[in-house]
Regions:
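Amphipathic alpha-helical segments in well-ordered regions
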Residues: 30, 134-139, 205, 209
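Membrane-proximal, non-transmembrane interface segments of integral membrane proteins
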Residues: 37-128
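Short hydrophobic membrane-inserting helices
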Residues: 1-53, 57-61
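Extracytoplasmic/periplasm-facing segments of secreted or lipoprotein envelope proteins
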Residues: 114, 120-147
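Amphipathic alpha-helical interaction segments
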Residues: 126-130, 134, 155, 197-201
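Non-transmembrane, amphipathic alpha-helical segments
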Residues: 19, 23, 116, 120-124, ...
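Charge-enriched, short contiguous segments at helix-coil
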Residues: 171-176, 182-218
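Short, charged amphipathic alpha-helical segments flanked by flexible coils
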Residues: 140-170
């Protein structure tokens, strides 16, 4: 029975990306108009059109530092854990379901967002933010943090850093990505090239998250 439930959950997850793509294509003009109406609003995190590109470049620099980080405390934990090989979006969602975590609509595949960006970069970044929030909530659950259901994504990010689940640099990078994606959600103009730069930055965090999934947290 448990296997049957797992399969049903998995099928529902696989259907999500196709549903989202259909909605974006079918109602792209309408959704874009909603974005356009918000352009005059003050953007969160102090991001304006003039500094949006600067934020992306700052995030790229932090991402390089995150990629070079060595975390010996996590290396010790991994030595005692069984390593699960994760290669595809199917593997990702299957593993998350096994660990009692919420699956990802995109299967954490960057190519999924690159495809969306070719239609509407802002919508793609909005979707990326959803996955980023899901990853952080799953990390909090994986590291057994007691998080209030009303906690904001920034509060969760801070709790993860204080617990040592993420490094200071990862914390900084997540905050930068939240600033960038929030600006996109609030209607700032984003080029496909800029969106793809952000996806490559996100790829670093996704890889770290995959590593956590592979050994199943502490």
């Amino acid at each position: 029975m448990e296997i049957a439930n797992l399969v049903l959950e998995y099928i529902k997850v696989l259907a999500w990306p196709f549903t989202v793509v259909f909605i974006l294509i079918a109602f792209r003009k309408e959704v874009s108009k909603l974005f356009d109406k918000t352009k005059k609003l003050e953007l969160p995190g102090g991001i304006s059109l003039e500094v949006f590109e600067e934020k992306i470049q700052e995030a790229k620099q932090i991402a390089k530092e995150v990629e070079k980080e060595e975390r010996p405390e996590l290396a010790e934990i991994r030595k005692t854990k069984e390593i699960h090989i994760i290669k595809t979006d199917a593997d990702v969602n299957k593993r998350m379901l096994e660990l009692g975590l919420k699956p990802s609509p995109s299967g954490l595949q960057i190519s999924y967002y690159q495809e969306l960006a070719s239609k509407d970069p802002r919508l793609a970044l909005a979707g990326l933010r959803i996955d980023l929030e899901l990853m952080l909530k799953n990390l909090a659950k994986g590291f057994q943090l007691e998080i209030d259901t009303k906690s904001s994504i920034r509060q969760i990010n801070n709790e993860l850093r204080e617990r040592g689940a993420i490094s200071n640099k990862q914390y900084e990078l997540i905050n930068k990505l939240l600033q960038i994606s929030n600006a996109a959600v609030h209607g700032i103009e984003v080029s496909e090239e800029q969106a793809n730069e952000v996806f490559e930055i996100m790829r670093i965090l996704v890889q770290d998250y995959m590593n956590w999934l592979s050994w199943g947290f502490p």
